[in-house]
Amino acid sequence: MPKREDIKKVLLIGSGPITIGQAAEFDFSGSQACRSLKEEGVQVVLVNSNPATIMTDPEMADSVYIEPLDARIIEKIIEKERPDGIIAGIGGQTGLNITSELAEMGVFEKYGVQILGTPVEAIKNTEDRELFKETMLSIGEKVPLSRAVHSLKEAEEVVEELGLPLIIRPAYTLGGAGGGIARTKEELLEITERGLRRSRINQVLIEESVLGWAEVEYEVMRDANDTCIVICNMENIDPMGVHTGESAVVAPSQTLSDEEHQMLRSASIKIIRALKIEGGCNIQYALKEGDYRIVEVNPRVSRSSALASKATGYPIARVTAKIAIGMTLDEIVNSVTKSTPASFEPALDYVITKIPRWPFDKFTTADKTLTTAMKSTGEIMAIGRTIEESLLKAFKSLDIDNQLGIKRWDEPEIKTLLKTPTSERLFVIFHALERGMSIKEIAELTSINPFFISKMKKIVEMEKCIRTEELTPEFLREVKRMGFPDSRLAELTGKTREQISDFRHEEGILATFKMVDTCAAEFEAATPYYYSTYEDTCETNSTDKKKILILGAGPIRIGQGIEFDYCTVHAVTALREEGIETHIINNNPETVSTDFDTSDKLFFEPLTMEYVMNVIERERPDGVLVQFGGQTSVNLALPLKKELKRRTDLNTVILGTDPEDMDLAEDREKFYLLMQELGIPQPEGGYATSQQEAIEVAKRIGFPVLVRPSYVLGGRAMEIVYDEIDLERYMKEAVRVSPEHPILIDDFLEAACEIDVDAVCDQIDVLIGAIMEHIEEAGVHSGDSACVIPPQSLSKEVLDQVRDYTRKIALGLRVKGLINIQMAEKGGKVFVLEANPRSSRTIPFVSKAVGIPLAKIAAKVIAGHSLKDLGYTDEPKPKHVSIKEVLLPFDKLPGADPVLGPEMKSTGEVMGVDYDFGRAYYKAELAADNLLPLTGKVFLSIRNADKPELVEAARKLQAAGLELMGTRGTVNYLAQHGIFMDTVKKVHDGSPNVIDMMRRDEVDLIINTPTSKMSRKDGYRIRRAAVDFKVPYITTIQAAVAAADAIETMKKGQDLTIKSINEYHKEMEQKEE
């Protein structure tokens, strides 16, 4: 069936900000779908609230709307754009939920929009837990015994019926949010209450436990002709009871018998046919000794399908988009081989391993247990010829300190950790094996298949041999084939990494590269996508063209999000436009940078010195770019420069800003001297190598001070310290100080306004992309603060000072490419806090706000163009207001305190655009799932220092018709200023207090700013309850003032502007002409 001619224009809904359970995989699938539809001549209208994505680039679709993913707003876009159809399954859970909501509102009927691909019925039959169970039973498939409940009373009845433990799964939620495993009746009621609040239709499924069964997934594809294929099957190393997004996964499945595989394959095809899903779909099974249960079906592109795409090279989202407009699998060409149709099932001749990356280094109080609800922020994937090689490369890719053999646990601890899955479980298994625990005992405690544990045991045994035996050339070849990195061999043999590497080269033991080609080398592949191993034949052919290698950003984690992948992709595009052959090395399966056709060659490898050098030795690029991949690639800059210098046989150089100059910016002492030389003020500061020294420095500067370790990303272990006792606690708990690793102590500028600048420098001119004014005060990590372009309250003098300092610093650091500078303004004086000569997390937001692609311009500057040649020297002047707001993951992390400070906690971001601050801020809050109420009750409990600023905001809220109430201190203070409101008890004064009111849905907004450590407990309980009961909350006084402005603007009855980002950019061009 050829493409439908009646579908000329299609609406795609993106997945919004990155959050736990929904990361970059939807940007990767969304941008693939956009390109796929445009190839077929279809007009694309895209809506997404997340500016840090490639899919929201103005050239990705015909019209790009960066607007809140809210049904009412999307209805307005439909009214304006009049699309013929909508594709729901590309935007993850968000896309599905909004499509279902729009269908229920009757929007599609009203405007004649067809749902393409998977029909709404199929979405209902998979997302509504009760309907799903009925559908499966009707086709004779087995599901766990279960009951759907809508109240706590019904939940109690289920215990009598099914016994404990029980698994709770809310309907229409993401990453298992709100669900969990209940081992007692109390846990059941607590999780059910949370789940009912999360579910869009207030429904929770309680099912019998299949804990400990194996979890297997099948990725299946179907077209309108009813042709079905299985793309990939994957096996979770962790058993049932751990969400698949939290589990280590291997593909293809390793422990299934051929009989089991055929049984599940047939079931998968039967299920996708029964549900009438068109496009890609993911089916999860619980399997035990030939018996199985269907756990769930995702009728959409998912995290697992992104993994399956990268594992097989089969572009699932691209094919799904073509099926949605009526094409069939035999008409679609496999874009990797360019010769076989998409109806050929992929074949693998390698093993992939995926391991999640968790944010527990940021949330020390959060519960680290892994359950059926997701907590990880990202993941890595590694490819090897054997499972051992694949596992060892995966560990190396995680970019965490806890490599094998570093952490030690004692016997009782080991048993507990094996029994209860945590993020450290795989490392614990290795440790248990080292201590001589048997495979059988570990398998019994963990319910992990003995096959996987025996493979880990092989690694442990090989380590013992490496420690005791001489490293002969034959033995070295054997351990390299197994996947041991040089750095680990150096640790085990007491040599240096360089010695191992040199010995390897002398003996001619070099990495070879194999190709991922979807067909186990049966057909010729046209898109080069490689992984390294130690075999004899190498499948990559080097060319004589000018080549540049770009280092990617690795797994998504707090502090290093999708923004750096965005910068990487832009750099690749810019260099390819210049005719330069561009290669990428990265290990994140969720991103656009690891898509098969982003670069000329993709190397799926760990981002460490050895693996980067392997690629350089084989391909001999002219240069390497390290400034686009965030801290991961910046950390490699200096060591890589040294290594390239040491290797006289290589002519590769590091391009862009010199690593020595990058280091100058990171090294506080050197940077301080440069600032003095340039005559630029900094907050008073110092550094300490002992506790005594720290107290002396802090006393000299005067409390409060900002303390942090040197060299960090996303402000790890950063704190504002108010007195000596607090400082002593920080020194004991947070950091280990030594002469090599001093701690930095700075004067904390209270109530200062923080400013961020992104710029490009070619060593002659400096292009300022934008000056951003932060809404939260200095002291909240810049990655967690909302910010606005253009600045709203800074004077012309301050802005001129900011521009002057930016130029001086960029030229003083000899920057070639991007630079981000953070400053603070207090009393009209500007201080420089820090400068980072690399890509920053605000680059995508700035590029979308002002309409110029900064990362692309930077890459062209590095390739040799001047800013004058490129025609970019003037700072753009937007006529609209753009606000970046962040998305915080507290609702997915029970126990973590939702308060902002100098340590970064957000996972993603959204953008609000309109013609004034009020409307833009309202949109940004709506997009960040923190809807500002226009009617109802507001609860205020504010620390003393913030009370003067509250008066004006409280007046505006009252004038807008909202009812105010608060704790005694706040009520009395406002009464002195003529604002009267009700008093509510503090939490520790007993009931009825604000938490009781939240439980009864009697509060519409919480404004609570944290005080000193002592009475924080009350505040913590209020803020935590706000998250758990889904009440919008604000924890800084500046955000409260901004919210009051936004509510005031909205109450004046002004409509929100609905315009595409393309239209806003066009207006800027017209004004400039």
From Swiss-Prot:
Q: Single Gene Ontology BP term? A: 'de novo' UMP biosynthetic process
Signal peptide region: none
Region span, Carboxyphosphate synthetic domain:
1-399
Segments for region (Carbamoyl phosphate synthetic domain): 541-931
The UniProt annotation puts the region (Allosteric domain) at 932-1073
GO molecular function per UniProt: ATP binding; carbamoyl-phosphate synthase (ammonia) activity; carbamoyl-phosphate synthase (glutamine-hydrolyzing) activity; metal ion binding
Give the matching SMART domains: CPSase_L_D3, MGS
Q: Cross-referenced Gene3D superfamilies, in alphabetical order?
A: 3.40.50.20, ATP-grasp fold, B domain, Carbamoyl-phosphate synthetase, large subunit oligomerisation domain, Methylglyoxal synthase-like domain
Q: Which residues bind Mg(2+) 4?
A: E834, N836
Give the residues the record marks as binding Mn(2+) 2. E296, N298
Record text on cofactor binding = Binds 4 Mg(2+) or Mn(2+) ions per subunit.
Write down the InterPro entries for this protein, in alphabetical order.
ATP-grasp, CarbamoylP_synth_lsu, CarbamoylP_synth_lsu_oligo, CarbamoylP_synth_lsu_oligo_sf, CbamoylP_synth_lsu-like_ATP-bd, CbamoylP_synth_lsu_CPSase_dom, MGS-like_dom, MGS-like_dom_sf
Q: What is its EC number?
A: 6.3.4.16, 6.3.5.5
Entry's Gene Ontology cellular component terms? cytoplasm
Which intervals of the chain form a coiled coil?
none
Q: What is known of its domains?
A: The large subunit is composed of 2 ATP-grasp domains that are involved in binding the 2 ATP molecules needed for carbamoyl phosphate synthesis. The N-terminal ATP-grasp domain (referred to as the carboxyphosphate synthetic component) catalyzes the ATP-dependent phosphorylation of hydrogencarbonate to carboxyphosphate and the subsequent nucleophilic attack by ammonia to form a carbamate intermediate.
The record's subunit annotation is: Composed of two chains; the small (or glutamine) chain promotes the hydrolysis of glutamine to ammonia, which is used by the large (or ammonia) chain to synthesize carbamoyl phosphate. Tetramer of heterodimers (alpha,beta)4.
Specify the protein name. Carbamoyl phosphate synthase large chain
Native species: Methanosarcina mazei (strain ATCC BAA-159 / DSM 3647 / Goe1 / Go1 / JCM 11833 / OCM 88) (Methanosarcina frisia)
